[in-house]
Curated annotation (Swiss-Prot):
Changing Y291A: Loss of ATPase activity, but no change in tRNA-binding. Changing R387A: Abolishes the tRNA-binding capacity, but no loss of activity. One of its GO terms (molecular function) is ATP binding. The record marks R502 as: Important for lysine 2-hydroxyisobutyryltransferase activity. This is tRNA(Met) cytidine acetyltransferase TmcA. The gene is tmcA. Disruption phenotype: Mutants lack the ac(4)C modification, but do not show any growth defects. Knockout mutant shows decreased 2-hydroxyisobutyrylation levels. Residues 356-531 form the N-acetyltransferase domain. Its EC number is 2.3.1.193, 2.3.1.-. Changing E292A: Loss of ATPase activity, but no change in tRNA-binding. It catalyses: cytidine(34) in elongator tRNA(Met) + acetyl-CoA + ATP + H2O = N(4)-acetylcytidine(34) in elongator tRNA(Met) + ADP + phosphate + CoA + H(+); 2-hydroxyisobutanoyl-CoA + L-lysyl-[protein] = N(6)-(2-hydroxyisobutanoyl)-L-lysyl-[protein] + CoA + H(+). Acetyl-CoA binds at I461, A462, V463, Q468, R469, E470, G471, T472, G473, R474, E499, R506.
Length: 671
């Protein structure tokens, strides 16, 4: 075939130029498969085949692609005929060598947007796959506008465009690139302080950090959220590589001349500050926006925490040439270029709402909103883009200046569960998909019917740094109330800090829950708050806030932090306590969810209850209790703790306990 000969010639040219390209095959399954095999036979290479079905040799499922990151391949096939795993697509593109093709298999072009996408099961919170017309139309626009991509459609004439030759490219030899060499020189002579290196993926920041460690005269310690992500760094650091996990490093008295923190923006800020203060020199590296990179706006705020920071950026790719067509196309398709916050939105702010249909009529507006929201966030995944475009129940507000988006709010519908399902969630018998706050209100709260109420959760909110402290965030929340009808509440879940809580409090929210362990992403306890919109919403917020006040002393003692509520010193078991204790004793409610009422039970009961008292009053570890009580593990310890709670309840009032047990055990019969 003449087209295969032309592709063979073009592939050789691409290898000389150090670039990769996308080739789309769109058509019926048989046609796509036949033409892919012809390409594979004509162009020598690895031909890694990413598909949910094992259609060919060298197959890998999208979910297993993570295991191949760090390896390199020549040519690959990405089968998106039944579902488009955007994160896997982005990750695959990063594994391809210079001179490679990424062959993208798509359904018949005209039928694509109406076809259910199997990948939607991961992000839509729907029981069945849904069609994703807005993402498909966006991708079609990108593909048809990209002069460097090749689109080969069934029953359409195929023509290979002439590509203007580029300058020859010379692959890296392992020695530092000129950009790295210059940066290394500056780091080697840096006075005591903190340096930050940011870069997109594939720019060699891990190699740079490893080369620094190998060259310094003194000792360095490496830390990171996950040791697996430091493999490249370790390779370049050689025998001087020494890794210690962040929490273990903080607990130790280790000293070194340099601390190197890989993917520093993913480490909770309070923990990072404590670590940095211990070492004379620190190098922080972070991936900027891209495949699960960090938003540039978040980085501005992050870097501002370190006065006199030396900030550097690597821009030159290492494994392919600058301006690689595949990298450019993937970035445009998955909107990896977030808001860079270089332009200040001017003029008065106007709040307006929009829905997902705007992706069809005016795609630039939701695109800018997404870029602002992802730019302000510490991490954005391609799943977020897919959810914003096509998941049901998504709503948006923008705060527009004269020429730029100054702020944005993303809301998600929640709640409205049936009475039976809400009760089953409260008891711990069921955990349906989605409904983050609505389910938590039931699963961790007092009211078994909490999830029947209908709310709208704040998923993300952002204001341009140059327009902050003008009340724009509060205007967005007020706008959400104005544009929202027939709901019981707005809700928000966030990593608790005093500054964040003051913002939500000024917006009118009521604190209803505080978690009992720190989140890995923020280093903070999770807080949940409600802004009531109906009488039922107001009653729920008041009831849960009252429970939080009763539990405040117990939570403060457990967490080691005072709660921002007025605590109630009330040791008497209430009706709500009895119900919740029965939920722990006879259903599957978690131990720490019931911390407050269990401590009140222990104060009331005269029984020994060693498993409960040991954990909650004496703060013994699970391992210690299992040894003392001769139990085989945590599961058996929890069974014993539930049995002890039941014994204590029966001893206080056997009739009431039996009635509650019978009532709650009925809730697991829900189908």
């Amino acid at each position: 075939m003449a087209e295969l000969t032309a592709l063979h010639t073009l592939t050789a040219q691409m290898k000389r130029e150090g670039i990769r390209r996308l080739l789309v095959l769109s058509g019926e399954e048989g046609w796509c498969f036949e033409h892919t095999l012809k390409l594979r036979d004509a162009l020598p290479g690895d031909w890694l085949w990413i598909s949910p079905r094992p259609d060919a040799e060298n197959h890998c499922s999208p979910s297993a692609l993570q295991t191949l990151l760090g390896r390199e391949f020549r040519h690959a096939v990405f089968d998106a005929r039944h579902g488009f795993d955007a994160a896997a697509f982005a990750a695959l593109s990063g594994t391809l060598k210079a001179g490679s093709w990424l062959v993208l298999l798509l359904p018949v072009w005209e039928e694509w947007e109406n076809q259910p996408d199997a990948d939607s099961l991961r992000w839509s919170d729907c029981p069945d796959p849904i069609a994703t017309p807005h993402f498909v139309q966006h991708l079609k626009r990108v593909l048809t506008a990209d002069n460097e991509a090749i689109l080969w459609r069934q029953n359409q004439p195929f023509s290979l465009a002439h590509f203007t030759p580029r300058t020859d490219w010379y692959p890296a030899t392992g020695a530092p690139q000129p950009e790295q060499q210059q940066l290394l020189k500056q780091l080697m002579t840096m006075p005591p302080g903190v340096a930050a290196v940011t870069a997109a993926r594939g720019r060699g920041k891990s190699a740079l950090a490893g080369q620094l460690i190998s060259r310094i005269a003194g000792r360095a310690i490496v830390t990171a959220p996950a040791k697996a992500s430091t493999d490249v760094l370790a390779q370049f650091a050689g025998e001087k590589f020494r890794f210690i996990a962040p929490d273990a490093l903080l607990a130790s008295d280790e000293q070194a001349d340099w601390l190197v923190v890989d993917e520093a923006a993913a480490i909770p800020a309070p923990l990072l500050h404590q670590l940095v203060s211990r070492f004379p020199r620190t190098l922080l590296t972070t991936t900027v926006q891209g495949y699960e990179g960090t938003g540039r706006g978040f980085l501005l705020k992050f870097c501002a925490r370190f006065p006199h920071l030396h900030r550097f950026e690597l821009q030159q790719p290492i494994r392919w040439a600058q301006g690689c067509p595949l990298e450019k196309m993937v970035s445009e398709a998955l909107v990896f270029d977030d808001e860079n916050f270089t332009h200040t939105p001017q003029g008065n702010i106007v709040i307006s709402a929009f829905e997902q249909t705007l992706w069809q009529s005016d795609p630039e507006t939701p695109l800018k909103v997404y870029q602002l929201l992802s730019g302000a966030h510490y991490r954005t995944s391609p799943l977020d883009l897919r959810r914003m475009m096509d998941a049901p129940g998504q709503h948006f507000l923008q705060a527009a200046g004269e020429n730029e988006i100054a702020g944005a709010l993303w809301l998600v519908d929640e709640g409205g569960l049936s009475q039976q399902l809400s009760q089953a969630v409260w008891a711990g018998f069921r955990r349906p998909r989605g409904n983050l706050v609505a389910q938590s209100l039931a699963a961790h709260g007092n009211n078994p019917l909490a999830a029947t109420l209908r709310g709208r959760r704040v998923s993300r909110i952002a204001v341009h740094p140059a327009r902050q402290r003008e009340g724009t965030g509060r205007q967005l929340i007020a706008g959400a109330l104005q544009y929202t009808q027939d709901l019981d509440y707005l809700s928000v879940s966030f990593g608790y800090t005093g500054e964040l809580w003051r913002f939500w409090q000024r917006c009118g929210f009521v604190l209803v829950r505080m978690g009992n362990h720190r989140e890995a992403s923020s280093g903070c306890y999770t807080a949940m708050a409600l802004l009531p919109m109906s009488d039922a919403g107001k009653q729920l917020a008041e009831r849960e806030h009252y429970r939080l006040r009763r539990d405040a002393q117990a939570l403060a003692q457990w967490n080691g932090e005072t709660l921002p509520v007025d605590p109630l010193n009330d040791a008497v078991l209430s009706d709500d306590d009895w119900l919740e204790l029965a939920g722990f004793a006879f259903a599957h409610r978690p131990l720490l969810t019931s911390l407050g009422c269990l401590l009140r039970l222990l104060q009331t009961s005269e029984l020994a209850l060693p498993a409960l008292r040991g954990r909650l009053q004496k703060n013994a570890s699970d391992a210690q209790l299992c040894t003392t009580l001769k139990l085989s593990g945590r599961k058996m310890l929890l069974v014993r703790q539930r049995e002890e709670a039941a014994q204590a309840l029966f001893a206080l009032n056997d009739v009431r306990t039996e009635r509650l047990r019978d009532r709650i055990t009925q809730w697991q019969l829900f189908h």
